Amino acid sequence: MTGFHFALEDYHGYNRFGNPAKALKAYVDCFSKEELTLDCQALVDIGYEMINHYVNEWLPRRNIYKTLIIDGVPQVEVESSIYIPELSEAFGIPVIYQLKYDRVVTDPDGRFWIQDHKTAASFNISKLETDPQVSAYCWAFPYIYGQTSAGMLYSQYKKAIVEEPRILKNGNISTDKTQNTTYERYLKALKERYGNITFPPKNKEVLDILLEQETPESDAFIRWDRVARNEHNNESEYLKILAEGYEMLNPKLAIYPNPTSDCSWSCNFYNVCLAQDDGSDWEFMINEDFEIRKHEEEIWRSKIQYPQ
């Protein structure tokens, strides 16, 4: 969800729109009605709800991280290129490792964290200890900022709408434990219905379940995980980067297709691949049916209308 990322970039950066929902609207306005399919519009609608929950409910109780600012420039969407001398010398060409940080923050103890925003249908934390992106970003940090980071603040946002607690026909609050709501919203609904007295046992049970989902850095819809990497991790990651580089730049590397059951529906080059195998003019197909993709981000960013 590029628009969601842009909204957070502006909000935690220069905050030119004053509200990330307005930033998302500015992003959407960069596209024509023809370009915004029904699926796109559905994601936009969810994006507004995700932003509302993040800004108005989740963040105010967890706003301990501050965007790093250097010479007046907020460190959001930080693009960097790191020269790799070993590979450059080995192949006789400049070899550059490129990456982009969503945001660099400091915690109350003054430590640096690389924040990475992820939108997904569900949370995934099982991969974090071995995630190569986490490791590579932490390895690169000293080359960019001259000091090590504490690690990555891996931030996940569910593509889901936080709903209000359901109200039954008799006016009572539903005790359905699968409601897509939060502890704060459910508690507010109970107080509005029953006042500050003791709540019905079944409602209290649901409230306790929702409370269990709340931590200093997470709820059922957003969670931030601190993923640490030390100096040894960084050294180990660099060796992997070198190994990958030697393989990628090897002029004698044999490159061949790796067909899977998904090819027929997920690969735009499916017919070209078949043509290459059966002797058809696959080069003609490439030249006639394909073009070099333009840098998508440059296109929409050039259309953003910032407030005057």
Feature-to-residue mapping (PLM):
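RecB-family 4Fe-4S metal-dependent nuclease core
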Residues: 1-308
